[in-house]
């Protein structure tokens, strides 16, 4: 089994890169959004929640991201700081971009959906100038969210961060984290997802996300073939999620299958 080496001398356990947003969830359960009146605000964005979750577990966590230069941007920075997440590389937009918003519609116990507002948003304004090599060097691992790859200049910033992590021996975690917003084509998704996945030590995604990632260069593979394909690159751990159906065993010693969890 290929082992992942984490440098214990590094001060930060993980630096996620990607979106920090606002989620607005209705308190009026089991109604369509047009009938909901009261909403509760939450921190949104997979990389942001990973950062906070690890900080609550006692880990030293940083973050690389862009937020709006307004009260909601202040909310994100203050929230991170209060949770113990290092905010030295969370910067503010100067062009009037706003935080992305996500509304959750909960129709019943088994049916829900989300509505995302992701036009002219702050997190996709992260630029190559925001990527600090010394900061990446300070981490045991770097996590890249796939949503950061959907548009420029965030796309180039993420690619620079991956390149610097590999240069400095920092393991790369790729959370495919697909959202349909802002992508221009299936080929574009496959091109940029594959470019990061082939540099990653750990890859996390659903079956559908792997299919998107591999559509150009290795389409049609099952779970075992998918794991073998990425083990043929740099990946030491491949996680293929199947939601509440769980995941079948993958015959690859360095792979992990994520079964559904009872709540």
Language-model regions, residue ranges each:
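Conserved phosphate-binding/catalytic region of the ribokinase-like
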Residues: 1-14, 163-167, 215-263
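Residues that scaffold the ATP/ADP-binding catalytic core of kinase and kinase-like folds
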Residues: 24, 115, 152, 213, ...
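Glycine-rich phosphate/adenosyl-contacting loop at the front of the ribokinase-like
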Residues: 2-86, 259, 263
């Amino acid at each position: 089994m290929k082992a992942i080496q984490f440098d214990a001398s590094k001060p930060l356990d993980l630096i996620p890169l990607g979106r920090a947003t606002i989620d607005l969830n209705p308190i009026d359960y089991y109604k369509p959004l047009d009938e909901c009146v009261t909403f509760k605000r939450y921190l949104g964005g997979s990389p942001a929640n990973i950062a906070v979750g690890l900080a609550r577990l006692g880990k030293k966590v940083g973050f690389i991201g862009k937020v709006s230069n307004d009260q909601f941007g202040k909310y994100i920075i203050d929230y991170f700081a209060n949770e113990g997440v290092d905010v030295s590389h969370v910067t503010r937009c100067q062009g009037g971009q706003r935080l992305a918003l996500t509304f959750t519609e909960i129709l019943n116990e088994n049916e829900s959906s989300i509505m995302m507002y992701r036009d002219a948003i702050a997190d996709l304004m992260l630029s190559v100038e925001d990527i600090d090599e010394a900061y990446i060097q300070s981490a045991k691992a770097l996590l890249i969210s796939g949503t950061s790859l959907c548009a420029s200049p965030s796309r180039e910033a993420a690619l620079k961060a991956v390149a610097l992590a590999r240069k400095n021996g920092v393991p790369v975690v790729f959370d495919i984290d697909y959202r349909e917003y802002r992508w221009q084509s299936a080929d574009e998704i496959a091109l940029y997802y594959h470019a990061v996945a082939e540099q990653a030590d750990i890859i996390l995604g659903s079956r559908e996300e792997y299919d998107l990632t591999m559509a150009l260069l290795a389409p049609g593979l099952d779970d075992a073939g998918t794991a073998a394909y990425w083990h043929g690159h740099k990946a030491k751990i491949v996680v293929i999620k199947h939601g509440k159906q769980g995941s079948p065993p993958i015959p690859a010693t360095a792979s992990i299958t994520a079964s559904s969890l009872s709540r």
